[in-house]
Every structure is written in C-alpha cells, then in structure tokens.
Amino acid sequence: MANPPFNLSDWGADKLEKDARWKFGIPPAGNANFAWMQHMIHHLSPVGRIGLVLANGALSSQTGGEGTIRQKIVEADLVEGIIALPSQLFYSTGIPVSLWFLSRNKQQLGKVLFIDARNMGTMVTRAVRELMEPDIRKIADTFEAFRNGTLEDEAGYCAVKTLQDIKAQDFILTPGRYVGIAEQEDDGEPFAEKMQRLTSELSGLFKESHRLEDEIKKQLGSIGFGIE
C-alpha cells in the first residue's frame, strides 16, 4: 500500500526521460502521479498487488500524455479496482482521492471493479472525516465478492465493467461514470398529488418572500435608505 505525494510537480523528470520504468509512457514533467505508479508496477512481482492512493485527477487527466499512459495500463489488464473515497480524509488536505488496486495476478481477467464510496464515513471533527469499521468492512466484502465472481452491481455504489466498457468511456476511470445513481425508494404519493402539494408549498414560499421583501424595504426606509 502506498500514499505518494499528490500531484508532485518537481520530481526530476528531466533526468529520467529514458528510464526503463516508463513502459507505458513518459510521465509529464509537471505531475509525478504516473511516475509513482509506473515505478511500482516496474517492481511488481508476477503475483504481486499494489494499493495506491492518488488524487482524483489521475482518473481522468489527459494532460501531458497521462490519458495515454492510463489507457495502456488498463489495456495491460493491470487495473483490478478503483475506489472513489470521500473528501476530508486527510488532516493535511481536503482534496478527494481514490484508491487504485493493480495486480499482475487478477482473478477476474478483463474486468475492473468500480466502487463509489464518496458518501461513506463520519465527520469526527468539523474538518476531518473517517471511514468507520462498517464502511471498511463493506468495501472489503465487496472486493472479496468481486474476486470470487459473486458480486452483483449495486446502483450508486459498485459496478463491474469490462475493458471494452472502459474503452467506450475513453479510459476515464471515475467510478461515478460506471456505478450510476442509487435507486430512490417510491414514497407511494401519486405524481399529480405530489405536484399539487409542491406547487402549493412553492406559492407559499413566494408569498413569504414578498412579505419579507416589503418588511426589509420598510425598515430601510425608516432609517433614511428607502428602496423604490
């Protein structure tokens, strides 16, 4: 498991242009995300796995050839799973990140698991969120079911996609593209009745807004700042 610096811009790219580790393409000089990833892949054993935390930009960036590098890594069938994590997990930064799981020994060849866990976790302070034991267990169980071939897609949370599916999305790996939207439970209220109720509530809000507007004008006028 690795957590390299996010989006590192000064990583000595000019000294490593012909490095043997860049099998999938030379990483851009302004961002080391795919340099870290290719360094780890280069040293990965035939049965090894990598867990890598990266800023979300690595999932979709096309800058400096990153899109091509990502495409080649996907086409090499090294990507086992992508998990989009909630924001505010780190004390040092609030940016959202993702977990990449790479493997040379995938049990589900030609398939990738996508998990959208952005809504998981609990705010433990006003600035920091933590994934709790039930959250971690759900994610772990989902991965285990995927590896065993027993996982069923869950709208809004997880989906298993083929390399062809990913190609159709231009090799962008953002989980939200693949898991869809969670199904909303039907409240049983007929559409016509719901619309009548909502429009009535909206009308009441408009009336209250006009009343407050008149009151504000009145108060401003009383202190010599009238509004026409």
Where are these regions (language model features)?
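A conserved structural/catalytic subdomain of Rossmann-like adenosyl-cofactor enzymes
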Residues: 1-228
